[in-house]
Amino acid sequence: MAKVCLNRLGGTNYSGVDCSAFVQAVYQDAYAVNLPRTTAQQVKIGHKVAYDNAQSGDLVFFKTGRKTRHVGIYLGGNTFMHASTSKGVILSRLDNPYWASTFWHFRNVQ
């Protein structure tokens, strides 16, 4: 679904991307869907999906700080793909204590 890339905050090419640019690039490559560039813009499109109804491809949003948001792509089975500021593009689990405590909501944008 996604190309492997290193992470650089604010990056927009495949040598490094932030979380929202990664999601934008994957959606363009995989689904030919044009998403907005920033997390603040991405969280306003599509519609919210209940936790139990989330499906592969839905966006998953987190509140990681007072004004900081993070976005990834849900893959199913409690797993999501995202660009981490410290580890690059990785798979993580929603039941990981950190992600569980910062989970905000899912959105379907397809």
Task: Indicate where each model-derived feature is located.
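Mature, Sec-exported extracytoplasmic domains of Gram-positive
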Residues: 41, 65, 102-104
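Catalytic nucleophile-His microenvironment captured as a short glycine-rich beta-strand/loop
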Residues: 67-76
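Short strand-connecting beta-turns/loops that link adjacent beta-strands
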Residues: 54, 65-67
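Structural motif
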Residues: 57-58, 78
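Aromatic- and glycine-rich peptidoglycan recognition patches
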Residues: 33, 75-110
